[in-house]
């Protein structure tokens, strides 16, 4: 067997040793696979991409009005987030806080979304979107889910909902099956162009302090991350939509007995976007 020398001492007759016997090795013991470390992926610091917009009031008394969102993202998951600022037109950057590490689902339109009626389900139109990162995804939605507000996105100056998201590879998706002009954006169903920004509402957007942003129409939201050589800025899309009442509907005219014309319409209230059963829209 094997022994280990614990102590030793010189004596007249020689050297005294204190030994400890080692446990014998098992007969079948041999070398083993040391395994592989679970190292995190070594991702580069990709630059920040940013979309900023104001969204319509959702009818919840606890929701700030106006509600301005900064949706920041990047090409990969190694992005550590960014610091957000507002430039009110004088070049000074006023801090708004961090964006957080979770990437928002944003992208740009590679094709043009054609105009369509906001009163009907748009089965004909489609648009191709290049997302900020190839690992970002979009989901399909049923008609019931659309009626409850699923897949709302800002595309240019229009809020749309889409039922179908078809992956095309390399971060591109084809969106189709639209509800158009949502949230009082009916006037923006025309005038779309390639290169305009898309931002999926309900993803990792940061709610900004509206008082800190200010009311200057030319204000821009600025993001600065570790991978950015220069600040990234974006104008605030849909500015004022949270405070502006939607356009009226159901215009009618009639001739009274005295020959005069009577014009009538139905006003819409902010916040009444869901199609609730048994309740007329306000």
At which residue positions do the language-model features occur?
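C-terminal extracytoplasmic interaction modules
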Residues: 1-282
């Amino acid at each position: 067997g094997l022994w280990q020398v614990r102590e030793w001492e010189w004596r007249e007759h020689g050297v005294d040793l204190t030994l400890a016997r080692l446990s014998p090795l098992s007969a079948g013991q041999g070398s083993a696979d040391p395994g592989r470390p679970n190292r995190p992926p070594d991702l580069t610091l990709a630059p920040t991409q940013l979309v900023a917009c104001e969204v319509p009031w959702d009818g919840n008394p606890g929701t700030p009005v106006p509600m301005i969102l900064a949706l920041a993202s990047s090409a990969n998951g190694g992005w550590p987030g960014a610091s957000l600022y507002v430039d009110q037109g004088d070049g000074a950057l006023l801090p708004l806080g961090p964006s957080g590490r979770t990437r928002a689902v944003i992208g740009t339109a590679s094709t043009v979304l054609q105009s369509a009626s906001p009163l009907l389900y748009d089965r004909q139109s489609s648009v191709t979107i290049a997302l900020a990162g190839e690992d970002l995804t979009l989901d399909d939605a049923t008609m019931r889910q659309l009626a409850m507000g699923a897949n709302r996105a800002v595309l240019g100056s229009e809020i749309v909902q889409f039922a179908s998201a078809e992956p095309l590879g390399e971060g591109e998706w084809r969106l189709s099956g639209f509800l158009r002009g949502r949230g009082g954006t009916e006037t923006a169903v025309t005038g779309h162009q390639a290169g305009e920004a898309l931002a999926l509402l309900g993803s990792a957007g940061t709610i900004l302090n509206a008082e800190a942003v200010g009311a200057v129409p030319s204000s821009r939201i600025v993001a600065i991350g570790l991978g950015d050589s220069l600040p990234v800025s974006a104008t605030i899309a849909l500015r004022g939509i949270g405070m502006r009442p939607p356009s009226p509907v159901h215009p009618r005219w009639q001739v009274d007995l005295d020959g005069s014309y009577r014009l009538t319409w139905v006003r819409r209230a902010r916040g009444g976007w869901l199609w609730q059963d048994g309740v007329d829209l306000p």
